[in-house]
Design a protein with these regions (language model features):
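Conserved alpha/beta cores of soluble small-molecule-handling proteins
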Residues: 1-165, 169, 202, 211-287
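Glycine- and Gly-Pro-enriched alpha-helical subdomains that act as flexible
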Residues: 164-165, 172-198, 203
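N-terminal G-site helix/loop of the GST-like fold
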Residues: 208
Length: 287
């Protein structure tokens, strides 16, 4: 369907209230990478908010592949899979006023990160907006409502940075507004990769893959709490996400990280991650 005809009702719960869950997928060789993990997260999130997706995992998989085939898309594609609670009879929060099935939208676009971003990296700015606590809006939910992250993003680009670095309610580093954050610390022969303890961030697919890559290749890595002091003193830093994979960080709050260029650990992890993606899509068979 042409994008100008792709519309939803103004009474849709996603439009009215941000009531829904979603996933972003990268496609290579005609296959969505790590599809099972993304569907796991989607269905777990939907169950947590009592949202009936209305389609099976297989039906969603077939719909994704059908969309890719209809648009002749094989490489360099980003897919956004969105599920909302559906159309309501009136603008109101209560899910019981929903009058139809869940709304499912698949947006597939040819979209790739700029090569310079992947090699030269990005800049971060620490915002005053904190990651929410699990008893307010659990950060583990990949919900449509992203206003907390959007406000942080606005603060970051207003300050001249590419993305926001966000702290948890206790002042430790949590994540960025749309990616996960890692630092490389220690001497050359004792380098260690650190990321947050995971309590205040989305259960990132790429984040998990990076930790598994480290374990498989003898690279010390762990989830822990650390502060901005550790960030400013880090040898390297990088962010992870489905769209761009692994991206180096040049500076945080105007403080140069390392020598301000992509470091050897980031370059190594980028290569290992690319191998993992290639292996995953090569093993897939389209339905």
């Amino acid at each position: 369907m042409p994008r100008e005809r792709a519309v939803v009702s103004v009474f849709d719960a996603g439009f009215l209230l941000g009531d829904g869950v979603w996933e972003g997928l990268r496609v290579w060789g005609g296959h969505p990478a790590f599809l099972e993990r993304h569907l796991d997260r989607l269905f777990e999130g939907a169950k947590a908010i009592m949202l009936d997706v209305g389609r099976s995992r297989r039906e969603l998989t077939e719909a994704i592949y059908s969309t890719l085939r209809a648009n002749d898309m094989t490489d360099g594609v980003h897919v956004r899979l969105m599920v909302t609670r559906g159309v309501k009879r009136t603008p109101y929060q209560d899910p019981r006023v929903t009058i139809g099935p869940a709304t499912v939208v698949i947006v597939a676009e040819h979209k790739e990160p700029l090569p310079a971003t992947v090699t030269d990296g990005i800049t971060l700015f620490t915002t005053h907006v904190r990651r929410a606590a699990p008893d307010t809006l659990d950060p583990k939910l990949n919900a449509h409502s992203k206003l907390n992250d959007i406000i942080a993003c606005i603060q970051a680009y207003t300050a001249g940075a590419d993305e926001a670095l966000m702290l948890d309610p206790h002042g430790f580093v949590a994540a960025c507004n749309s990616t996960h954050f890692f630092v490389v610390v220690g001497a050359d022969d004792e380098s260690e990769v650190l990321t947050s303890d995971g309590r205040y961030c989305l259960a990132g697919i790429t984040r998990a893959n990076v930790l598994e890559i480290c374990q498989a290749n003898g690279i010390p890595a762990r989830e822990t709490t650390f502060s901005l002091t550790d960030v400013y003193a880090a040898r390297e830093a990088f962010v992870t996400g489905t769209f761009a994979g692994i991206v180096p960080v040049r500076s945080v709050d105007g403080r140069t990280i390392g020598d301000g260029r992509r470091g050897p650990m980031v370059e190594r992890l980028q290569a290992l991650y690319r191998e993992l993606v290639d292996a995953d899509v090569a093993a897939r068979i389209a339905p």
